[in-house]
């Protein structure tokens, strides 16, 4: 990230990532935290994170922002909770400028999370590398990094140029 970037924290929840994102953008950068639930945003405000970012209630599949509004899109824990990951990732691409960076994050890797929940890892899991690469490619993103470690799952992508 660069100072002065316009950054969207999609599905920001209580705003846990907002202090780090604000530090990266500096005081002049635009920082927006979006979440579906009023309760999560109220908790973010209670924790003082409304002073760091503009907090907006909204649905990731129908974002209340103009096309090409953000230089960076960050989402922690979002992808596995999207009823239609294709629609959500396509909508994130819509509001991203050409060349924007996308960071998809989860604080636990796939294998560790599967063990924690007593599940088997499957190839059709939305967070599997082949599946997330396919989803992102089909929705306007170019994957530059996939990191699936025990203590994190991180995918970085760049918004492809549009005609």
Model-flagged regions — what are they?
Residues 139-141, 147-163:
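Core SAM-dependent methyltransferase catalytic element
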Residues 86-98:
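A short glycine-rich, Lys/Arg-flanked "PGG" loop and its adjoining helix->strand segment in the class I
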Residues 124-139:
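Short alpha-helix
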Residues 8-10, 14-62:
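Class I SAM-dependent methyltransferase SAM/SAH-binding core
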Residues 107-123:
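Short, glycine-/aromatic-enriched active-site segment of Class I SAM-dependent methyltransferases
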Residues 72-84:
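A short SAM/SAH-binding and catalytic strip from SAM-dependent methyltransferases
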Residues 61-72:
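A short acidic, Gly/Pro-enriched loop at the edge of an enzyme's catalytic core
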